[in-house]
Every structure is written in C-alpha cells, then in structure tokens.
Design a protein with these regions (language model features):
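Short, solvent-exposed beta-strand-to-loop segments that form ligand-recognition rims
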Residues: 134-152, 197
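Extracellular glycan-recognition modules
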Residues: 37, 41-99, 129-130, 162, ...
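Extracellular glycan-interaction patches encoded by glycine-rich segments
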Residues: 36, 103-109, 148-169, 173, ...
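Short hydrophobic/aromatic patches on beta-strands that form ligand-binding or substrate-lining surfaces
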Residues: 58-68, 121-123, 154, 168-174, ...
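Short, aromatic/His-centered strand-loop micro-motif at the edge of beta-sheets
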Residues: 98-120
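Extracytoplasmic low-complexity segments
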Residues: 1-43, 187-320, 327-343, 347-350, ...
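Localized edge beta-strand/strand-to-loop motifs within extracellular or lumenal beta-rich domains
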Residues: 117-131, 175
Length: 399
C-alpha cells in the first residue's frame, strides 16, 4: 500500500522511503550534494557528532550507493577528523574506486568498486593493521593504523569541501576490530543482542549505530540506536522528495539467522555466498528493487515430517527467504553441507525443492532438480517467494 510522505517523513532533504524486504518502511539518507562544488561548500547537507575519544582499534561499516558512476576525487561520505591534517575519510579516488584516505596512508576498496547500486564497506583496525572489506570480501591489508578522532561526520570529507552525492544506510562504529566472519554474518541484518559484541549497554563495543529507521530520524536529529546516545545533528536541510531505495537487509525470524546471505544487484551474475549449503545465481543482473536475503535454522541431518506426496525425506535444515520485488534464480543445494550426510546421490529428477509460507505445516513441491554435479543439486528458473525452503528426495537413500 502507498504511504503518505507528509505523514511519515520528517521535513528535511535527504530522507528517502526505503521499502524493506518485509514490506515495512524504513529510511535511507541521501546526501544529494552538488558534485561540482570544490570550495566554500559549507552549505552541503551533512550530519555530525562531536567526538573526543581517539581509537586505534575500531570497525566502521556502512552501506553506500553513489549517485554517480564516477564521483570526483575527495567526494566523501564519512570522516573522523575536522581537517585533512589527521584522521581519515571514506571517499572517491576519482577513478571509480571507493577509498580509505588517512593521514598515515590510503587504500582502495578495489577497482570499479563505486557503482550506482548498494555496496557494503567495512574498515577494521587492530592497533597495527588496517583492513578493508568490500561486500564482505577482504580487499586490502596495510601495516598502519589511523588513530586520531575528534568528530564523526557523514555526508562530506574532512576539509568540508567536495561534498558527495551518496545514499548511506546502516552506519556502525565499534571500538574493536570485528572479524571478517562477524562482518559477513551481520551485513545483511540489523543489529540485535545476539551479536557477540552488543548487549545494548554503554559498556558494549558498539559506540554508534545509525539505522535510518522511522524512529531514529526526527527533525534535524539522527538518533544513535546504540546505548550511548551519540546522536548526530543534521545541517543544511531542505525540501524532501519521495524516492524509493533498497538495501539488501532483512529481519529474518531469530531461529533462521544462521549464515545470512543475499543476492542483489551488486552480485551481478556471480553466485551468492552459501548459507550452509544453499546458494543462488541469476542469469542477468538484478535491478535495485529486486533482491533476496536468506538464512537457515542451523540444523543438520534429515526429517520425514511435513512432506508432500511423492517425497520420502527432506533436509532438517530449513532456509528462510525474504525478498523484495521479483527474483527468478537458480537455487543450488549442496547435500553434504545441508545435511552433514554423504548419501548415494540420485538422478536430478529424484530431488524436489519444497516451500511453505510459515514456520509450520506441510511443504509443497515448487521445483524438480534440473542437474547434478557431485552432490550439488540445481533447481533452475525458480521464482523465489518469501517463506521457507528445504530439499527433499523421492528415495530416502538420496539424502
């Protein structure tokens, strides 16, 4: 259903309706700044927190989408210091790459890393090394750390010039270096207290969390959703326009948040990462509004419950899928990864992909296996629906 923007959105520039994959409405900040301004850009839209704690161990993660395919050099969207003499910023290097630019050094997030679709960036520092991650993949390791902080700003660089034209969401600042597995595990879901470093206490490692939800934006204040109250003041606000924007994040049922992965526009036609045996691929790059997020119930072995006629056994592992828009994908399930078993693999047609809408009730068959490679079964051309999936077999020896 449509929502009234005047009823739902506070009246300042840059708050955009972001349809979440669960059909709720959250928001994303659009720093739609003038990409031609190179000096005296003090009228640009930005958010700021006063900060007085230097950190040599930290993690900064952020979902970002560029408003242009090749922003000019120094067009920034995050920084931690009030001049270029110290601290660092996340910006464009002017050659199509997101960059970590610091007083002690700089590093890139990979060639062609700037796109006009959503990408996840993360920076970690452990006191001696700085690492960069792009969509969960380690892309840079350097033997230096920038440890000087006197502010946290979003929407511009340290010099307050060359503001950026970027959408940003899910900004998280920690005073510890998270592992790659932690970054990957949480990039497609909002934070909750099941995170090892977060219990909603001021003693937690999480120091700033800008979720961009309806409850976190009010007037010219962007509220910190950590326990610390590090709210950002928003400056140079203007008129609001209604534009939809989509970040591949979902709130899956808590019992199905093991190994949460996604397939979205930045995945192009590459396989998604595997959620304990299940991967997805698409034949053509998804548009921004179309994506799927999926996790599983962390259960191995097999089951004979809730089966439709014509099947004898299914995986006890159940994958929950949440999706936005329309996604048609090949779903590939690795039997040994899914069940922990090493069965006699049958013909592709012996396998069925089952689906149900809720957490209980009988499954229905939605696809028959199209090919087998080792113990990987491919179900091709699946119209992905929200709900719960398992792999089943017509012969109990095949799982």
């Amino acid at each position: 259903s449509q929502i009234s923007y005047s009823q739902m959105i506070p009246s300042f520039q840059g708050v955009y309706d972001k349809k979440s994959s669960s059909d709720g409405s959250t928001y994303v900040l659009d720093f739609d700044n003038d990409d031609t301004c190179t000096s005296n850009c003090t009228n640009s839209f930005y958010g700021e927190i006063g900060w007085n704690t230097n950190m040599s161990s930290y993690t900064v993660s952020i979902w970002v989408k560029s408003g242009s395919s090749n922003p000019g050099t120094w067009r920034g969207f995050f920084n931690c210091y009030s001049s270029s003499s110290d601290g660092f910023q996340l910006d464009s290097d002017g050659s199509g790459r997101y960059r970590f630019l610091a007083n002690v050094g700089n590093a890139k997030f990979g060639n062609n890393s700037i796109t006009t679709t959503w990408n996840h960036l993360a920076v970690t520092a452990d006191g001696s090394q700085t690492k960069l991650y792009y969509n969960g993949n380690l892309v840079s390791t350097d033997s230096w750390v920038e440890n000087t902080w006197n502010q946290i700003e979003i929407g511009r660089n340290r010099n307050t010039d060359r503001p950026g034209d970027y959408f940003i969401d899910e900004v998280r600042v920690w005073n510890t270096d998270l592992t790659q597995s932690q970054i990957q595990a949480w990039m497609h879901k909002t934070l909750d207290t099941s995170h090892d470093n977060y219990s909603n206490s001021t003693s937690d490692n999480l120091k700033v969390y800008f979720q961009m939800s309806s409850s976190s934006i009010s007037g010219t204040t962007l509220s910190d959703q950590s326990a610390n109250g590090n709210n950002a003041s928003l400056y140079n606000v203007g008129e609001v326009e209604l534009v939809s924007s989509y970040v591949p994040i979902s709130d899956l049922n808590s019992s199905y948040e093991t190994n949460v992965e996604a397939i979205w526009s930045a995945s192009t036609t590459s396989s998604s990462d595997a959620s304990n045996g299940l991967t997805m691929t698409v034949s053509s790059t998804l548009s921004e509004e179309n994506f799927a997020v999926f996790g599983n119930n962390n259960t191995s072995n097999t089951s004979t419950s809730d089966l439709p006629n014509g099947t004898a056994i299914r995986s006890a592992r159940i994958w929950q899928v949440d999706k936005s828009g329309t996604v048609s994908a090949s779903i590939i399930i690795d039997i040994s990864d899914a069940t922990g078993n090493s069965p006699t693999v049958g013909a592709a047609t012996n396998y069925k992909l089952l689906h149900r809408i809720g957490t209980s009730g009988n499954f229905t068959s939605v696809a028959t296996g199209g090919s087998v490679s080792g113990d990987n079964i491919t179900f091709s051309g699946v119209t992905v629906h929200k709900g719960f999936y398992v792999i089943a077999a017509t012969d109990s020896s095949n799982l």
